[in-house]
């Protein structure tokens, strides 16, 4: 997995509508907030994302709140976004 360049990120972002590129600690990250009707549904979604992450051995930051889950993907090892982040975002969107 190689860290994506700014040009590669710009080319790939249309594949993940609803997601945003953010920068934290000098690293590009893929971020999206999902809305739900209640905490139980948000928690269930968090667990399903966790299952996907375990299967792929690629783990996001997950913030679960009442009616909302924020998912942030990036590679700790590469220090920014990688193609796997786009792939995982797409899989998460399909849940």
Located regions from the model:
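Alpha-helical scaffold segments that form or flank carboxylate-/histidine-based iron centers
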Residues: 31-40, 69-77
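Short amphipathic alpha-helices within nucleic acid-binding modules
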Residues: 40-47
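C-terminal structural segments of small proteins and small subunits
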Residues: 70-95
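N-terminal first-folded block
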Residues: 1-37
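Solvent-exposed alpha-helix faces
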Residues: 47-48, 90
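Short Gly/Ser/Thr- and Asp/Glu-enriched loop/turn motifs at secondary-structure junctions
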Residues: 64-68
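Short arginine-rich
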Residues: 21-22, 48-60
């Amino acid at each position: 997995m190689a860290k994506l360049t700014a040009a590669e990120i710009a080319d790939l972002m249309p594949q993940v509508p609803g997601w945003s590129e953010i920068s934290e600690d000098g690293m590009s990250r893929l971020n999206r907030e999902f809305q739900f009707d209640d905490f139980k549904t948000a928690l269930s979604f968090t667990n399903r994302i966790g299952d996907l992450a375990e299967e792929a051995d690629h783990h996001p930051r997950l913030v679960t709140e009442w009616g909302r889950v924020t998912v942030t993907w990036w590679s700790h090892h590469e220090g920014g976004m990688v193609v796997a982040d786009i792939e995982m975002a797409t899989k998460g969107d399909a849940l």
